[in-house]
Swiss-Prot record:
Keywords, ordered alphabetically: Amino-acid biosynthesis, Cytoplasm, NADP, Oxidoreductase, Proline biosynthesis
Enzyme superclass (EC): oxidoreductase
Gene: proA
One cellular component (GO) term of this entry: cytoplasm
Protein name per UniProt: Gamma-glutamyl phosphate reductase
GO BP: any one term: L-proline biosynthetic process
Organism: Ruthia magnifica subsp. Calyptogena magnifica
């Protein structure tokens, strides 16, 4: 226990010292670091895949679910995506040092705000090894030092990627402790990290609801959290048939194990006969298990009766709940009761109802005629994201560069004194 505590103290002290220099680093230096990291990843593909394969074999031997193994897997396409997200972050404007709202006051002074890093961030995540790069890159570009703690199931993949990060930082001449990895499977390290308020300014957990709630309940530092993604797609009575089928099918089946996948499909009763039978057939052909309300059950004997628990479940699997509603008000009421505040989408050609939907639905992302799968920092032009916050404070929705910053007041005078 003492050795783990000492480890976190050492990492915390290193991170805090590194943050002092990183917040003053130039945009060129930070971008060069990311360029170097991308180059290191490209040059070390073989060792990264070897490490990832070791994690996949261990995961299969331990009986990890298919969706978890999918999150864990790295292939050429996904590694190319990691490099592309680095390039996108490089091309994003550097928010640090930006001065806004600079105004003269009656006293003659000018008062404005300057964007600054949060300081030291602790990122705790499960399964997805690409988070090692996404988190490090966003923290470095936004001037924050970071302590990373990945899931034990991805320990070899995370270390292989972290080695690329460390080498990229070193090549750019920045403090190597700008990014550090807790390379132990001991859970005490997580407990100590979230309590390290003397060193860590904020904790960002990425993982299942159980992990996020446990960290939120025990942390002594602010937590930017993403609890879960019970996302809804609502097909309105005036929905275009082709759009509705395409959007609803993609929102569920593009990838099952992601937080922006639709888990519940709501369909207006007036749209059922022309849209739902074909959509149900497509889902069943794809192998999606369907659970429906009483009215939905009448459409196919292959649909299972939905329970109250289903409406509150983030499946992260090839399972979809379907409910037929008699009005948009009923759909919104369902979302308010069962949603997690992540992402909801309406499919409709009616402008007034679409506007009403995005106004009344209280979620981090609300869409019109688009798949919930677009709820992603990369798709929003933020570069990679550290997570999708379902909180309303300090940041909401995909957490990109600006979400990892704060503002301080600056005052400009010319010998002004207060009377």
């Amino acid at each position: 226990m003492d050795s783990i505590k000492n480890l976190i103290v050492t990492l915390g002290e290193n991170a805090k010292n590194a943050a002092k220099t990183l917040r003053c680093a130039t945009t060129v230096a930070k971008n060069n670091t990311l360029i170097n990291i991308a180059s290191q990843i490209d040059q070390n593909r073989a060792s990264i895949f070897k490490a990832n394969n070791q994690d996949l074999v261990n995961g299969k031997n331990k009986g990890l679910e298919t969706t978890l193994l999918d999150r864990l897997m790295l292939d050429e396409e996904r590694l190319n995506g990691v490099i592309e997200s680095l390039n996108q972050i490089i091309n994003l404007p550097d928010p640090i040092g930006e001065i806004t709202d600079l105004k003269y006051q009656p006293s003659g002074i000018q008062v404005g705000k300057m964007r600054v890093p949060l300081g030291v961030l602790g990122i705790i995540y499960e399964s997805r090894p690409n988070v090692t790069i996404d988190a490090a890159a966003l923290c470095l570009k936004s001037g924050n030092s970071v302590i990373l703690r990945g899931g034990s199931e991805a320990i070899h993949s995370n270390y292989a990627l972290y080695t690329c990060v460390r080498q990229g930082i070193k090549q750019a001449g920045l403090n190597e402790n700008c990014a550090q990895l807790i390379n132990t499977q001991n859970h005490e390290a997580v407990i100590e990290l979230v309590k390290a308020s003397d060193y860590v300014d904020a904790i960002i957990p990425r993982g299942g609801k159980g992990l996020v709630e446990a960290i939120s309940n025990s942390a002594k530092t602010p937590v930017i959290k993403h609890l879960n993604g019970i996302c809804h797609t609502y097909i309105d009575k005036d929905a275009d048939k082709k759009k509705a089928i395409s959007i609803a099918f993609n929102a569920k089946t593009r990838r099952y194990g992601v937080c922006n996948a639709t888990e519940t499909l709501l369909v207006h009763a007036c749209a059922v006969s022309r849209i739902l039978p074909k959509l149900i057939a497509q889902y069943l052909t794809k192998g999606v298990e369907l659970r429906g309300c009483k009215e939905t059950l009448k459409l196919s004997n292959k649909i299972i009766a939905a329970t109250e628990k289903d409406w509150n479940t983030e499946y992260l699997d090839a399972i979809l709940s379907i409910r037929i509603v008699n009005s948009m008000s009923e759909a919104i009421k369902h979302i308010d009761k069962h949603g997690s505040g992540h992402t909801e989408s309406i499919v409709s050609e009616n402008y007034t109802r679409s506007r009403r939907f995005i106004t009344e639905v209280d979620s981090a992302s609300v869409m019109i005629n688009a798949s919930t799968g677009f709820a992603d920092g990369f798709e929003y032009g933020l570069g990679a994201e550290i997570g999708i916050s379902t909180d309303k404070f300090h940041v909401r929705g995909p957490v990109g560069l600006e979400g990892l910053t704060s503002q301080k007041f600056i005052v400009l005078g010319d010998g002004h004194i207060r009377q």
